[in-house]
Each structure stands twice: as C-alpha cells, then as structure tokens.
Amino acid sequence: MIQQAIAKLLEGEDLTRAEAALVMTEIADGGATPAQSGAFLAALRMKGETVDEIAGAADVMRQRADRVRVDRDVFIDTCGTGGDGRHTFNISTTAAFVAAGAGVCVAKHGNRAVSSRSGSADVLAALGVNVDADKETVERCIEEVGIGFLFAVRLHPAFKAIAGVRRELGVRTIFNLLGPLANPAGARHQVLGVYEARWVPVLGGVLAALGAAHAFVVHGEGLDEIAVTGMTHVCEVRDGQVERYTIRPEDLGLPRRDAAELVGGDAVANARIVTDVLEGQAGGPRDAVLANAAAALVCAGAAKDLRDGVARAARSIDSGAAREKLRQLVAATTVPA
C-alpha cells in the first residue's frame, strides 16, 4: 500500500482516512522499508496533511498504543505538539498540576525534548517524578493522586522504528502532530497547543473526527499555548461541533505580558520556574499557567468559562493544592531504596 500511497501523494492527491490508516499500519508492522517510510513522510509533508490523513494515522497510533486504563468518565490531557521554537518553560505541564489541584483527573501524555531544551518528561524528571514508572504505577497515580504521566516513548512501541527515519529527515512530519492525538489512556477532553496557527482548524477537525468530547486547539503569538502576550487562535470542539475564535489575555482578566518573561532554560531551570509558579510566585509564568489551566478546567466541565477557569486555577495554586499534587506524584513514582 505504501508505494501506491507515495505515487498518489506525488501527484498531489489526498489519501482517504482508510488509506492513511493502512499505510501507518504497514509502517507499524515493519512492512515498509526506511526509504519508503521517509518518502511517504516527505511526500505527505510536501502535499500538506489533511484532516482525513491525520485522523487515519491517529486511528492506528491509538490502536497500537500500550493502553493505560483510567476508571473515570472525564479526564484530560494538556499535551501539545511542541516545536514552536520559542524556548518557553513547560507551561502546559505546569497547568496539568494546577488542573489536578482543582479536582480534575489528568492523564498527561508527553515525551522528552526534540527541538526544545526541556520536554515534559525532562522537566518532570528534574522535579523528581519517575517518568519511567511502569504502566501499573501510572494507572495507580491517576486513580489515587489524580494525575499521572504517560511517557510516549514507552507507550507507543510500534513506532519506535520510525524514530530513526524522522531524525534523518530532519524536518517536521505528520508525527509532529500525532503525539497529542494519541493519548494512550484515550482522553476525550484536552487542550492541544500547535506550533503554527494554520494547524488550529485542521486539528480541530481531526479531534471532531476522532470523537473528542470537549477540546481546545490553540496557538498564541508563536506558542503552542494560550498566549498572555497577545492574541490566541482557538478552535473549540464539543461533541462534533467546531467553533473558531480568538482570545486575548484581557478577555480572561489577565494582564498582557512580555514574551521574555516566559523564556525558560534547560530542564533544571524550568523545574525551578514550575516550582516558583506552584509556590504562588506572581508574574508572567503564573499568568501563562492560569490561562492554560483555565482551558483545561473548562474542557473538563470544572469551570463555566475561561474567566471562571482562571479564578479556579488561581485558587488551586494559592491553596497549595497544585503543589501538593506534584509532591504526591513524586512520592507515588519513587522507587523505594
């Protein structure tokens, strides 16, 4: 199938959702050579990935994931694409603890850094979380603590082989979009930041096709986050309905911040910023976390709108609840000596 798909893409033709799924299955099963996989990814990138193509690929990634069981009707993910090149601290990871502190169950999907200096796995490890915890421990964390980290590299074994091809290509491919769409626990409520504004409506359409219950796809001022530095493009998906709009920090009751306030460093430096935010330190990093945690609370049904979400997120931090969730996750994943 992959040879036919490559030929079709080179003619500028789109693949159906089923065709994209067949090719991804072939790649996952080891039926495609590295040259074929690379040609497919490059041809698809050159043509431009469609909603159906991304949805078909995501179908297979979800099916092949090592499934994490979550015994909750509503739980969220705050995994974004990364790759925005702005080197901010780990905003969505911090927002996950704030959401958990506000009573929302979180199955946080993530990975180590690819283009940044600190991915979610890197900063969590620097904070003392054992990101390599086995699946049973992760499930227990989600159930007992209310938050767990789903390490992508451990839970998507079928796609380890493609990592080398992606590295050798050295350009963004469909895989840069697939991570947030393939939560191994099957989260249907999520905040998904994308690295370019053009992907906001596309991934909104993909999430609708994949059956998202309530999700936000966002890109703000060059960030794969809701921005407190200017305008954010939003695609809100709710039970198959898609709504597009823009928001500004003032709409959330937050001041406009300078982008320089949000710049992080390596995992250790970012862990310090995360800790400062969770300990209640005021400033740009806190406001960025409040904005993104607010969206997480809205999609989980724990806040009526984004302004209400900001207020609830602030209480999660100021009460110490968010910081306590981090402490509990560290304790729950620590291997006894």
Curated annotation (Swiss-Prot):
UniProt keyword annotations, A-Z: Amino-acid biosynthesis, Aromatic amino acid biosynthesis, Glycosyltransferase, Magnesium, Metal-binding, Transferase, Tryptophan biosynthesis
Gene label: trpD
GO cellular component, one term: cytosol
Record: residues binding anthranilate 1: 80, 111
UniProt name for this protein: Anthranilate phosphoribosyltransferase
Pathway: Amino-acid biosynthesis; L-tryptophan biosynthesis; L-tryptophan from chorismate: step 2/5
Pfam families for the chain: Glycos_trans_3N (PF02885), Glycos_transf_3 (PF00591)
Protein family (similarity comment): Belongs to the anthranilate phosphoribosyltransferase family.
Coiled-coil residues: none
Function (record text): Catalyzes the transfer of the phosphoribosyl group of 5-phosphorylribose-1-pyrophosphate (PRPP) to anthranilate to yield N-(5'-phosphoribosyl)-anthranilate (PRA).
Species, as recorded: Anaeromyxobacter dehalogenans (strain 2CP-1 / ATCC BAA-258)
EC code: 2.4.2.18
Domain of life: Bacteria
